[in-house]
């Protein structure tokens, strides 16, 4: 089984070397021109960039980022534990975990494309819907249904793209070009803190209730709160 880790390790080393050689802060550093051309901002985008939320509203937005990132990381890593604790076969649970990873990869590709095509506001509903549905399906783990397990893995993985790609998109939407780096740093700090704060919850709740499923129910509710917070902030720009 140890040999299974060699492939990902070699791939990560090769990818890191490629990124180090090719990625620069400025395309001109490699004698290149930026791909494409600057798009015209819509009235909605200009209104978002001009938005100046109150301190309370901004604190709620950062809390939403913290929750999304912490729940995304914690729910993903505990998925296999959830189903094995409910008596699912280890190999089936491992297959579901792998499927979740593939769905996450697909979600990262789709997230940006959806935001470009539909806009961030509508894309948030779609991606959060998948995310929340995945966690709701996880609460049904005690039923020991292989079909529900695989479905939960797909929806949870696809929606988990929000806690990586989504954060940079929200930072771009809710800032100006001058403030983008500052806002992104704040969101990244919330991202890191979320992983620390939320990581202990599944185990603690399982100790109290005898199951990991209630933790996923709590996570679904917190994601719904995060969706409400972000979308209500976006709607401020529509007034």
Language-model segments: what does each one mean?
Residues 130-143:
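C-terminal ends and interior cores of transmembrane alpha-helices
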Residues 174-209:
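A late C-terminal transmembrane helix in Major Facilitator Superfamily
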Residues 24-47, 239:
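Flexible cytoplasmic inter-helical loops of multi-pass small-molecule transporters
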Residues 1-28:
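Helix-loop-helix hairpin linking two adjacent transmembrane segments in secondary transporters
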Residues 108-119, 206-207:
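Helix-to-loop junctions at the C-terminal end of transmembrane segments
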Residues 55-111, 198:
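Extracytoplasmic gate region of multi-pass secondary transporters
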Residues 117-128:
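Cytoplasmic membrane-interface "Motif A"-like loop-to-helix N-cap segments
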Residues 162-175:
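Intracellular juxtamembrane helix-capping segments at the cytosolic ends
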